[in-house]
Amino acid sequence: IIFVVGGPGSGKGTQCEKYGYTHLSTGDLLRVDSSNGFLIDGYPRQGEEFERKRLETYYK
């Protein structure tokens, strides 16, 4: 497992694609759930970080 860490729009997905890694984005997962009616407290908004505690609770 390789973690690519960076802020929104920093190129994490681009780097994964460049080197042939599978890109699993927490933000993408939240957006998919949001489209299915599981938007949590107005998150995720573009450029905002999701609080770690909320994320851990949400995906347990």
Curated annotation (Swiss-Prot):
Keyword set includes Transferase: yes
Record-linked SUPFAM superfamilies: P-loop containing nucleoside triphosphate hydrolases (SSF52540)
Main subcellular localisation: cytoplasm
UniProt EC number: 2.7.4.3, 2.7.4.4, 2.7.4.6
Enzyme type, top EC level: transferase
InterPro entries: Adenylat/UMP-CMP_kin, P-loop_NTPase
Cofactor(s) demanded: Mg(2+)
Domain of life of the source: Eukaryota
This protein's GO CC annotations: cytoplasm
Modified residues (Phosphoserine): S25
Keywords: ATP-binding, Cytoplasm, Kinase, Nucleotide-binding, Phosphoprotein, Transferase
One Pfam assignment: AAA_17
Role: Catalyzes the reversible transfer of the terminal phosphate group between ATP and AMP. Also displays broad nucleoside diphosphate kinase activity. Plays an important role in cellular energy homeostasis and in adenine nucleotide metabolism. Also catalyzes at a very low rate the synthesis of thiamine triphosphate (ThTP) from thiamine diphosphate (ThDP) and ADP.
Subunit description: Monomer.
Annotated family: Belongs to the adenylate kinase family. AK1 subfamily.
The protein, known as: Adenylate kinase isoenzyme 1
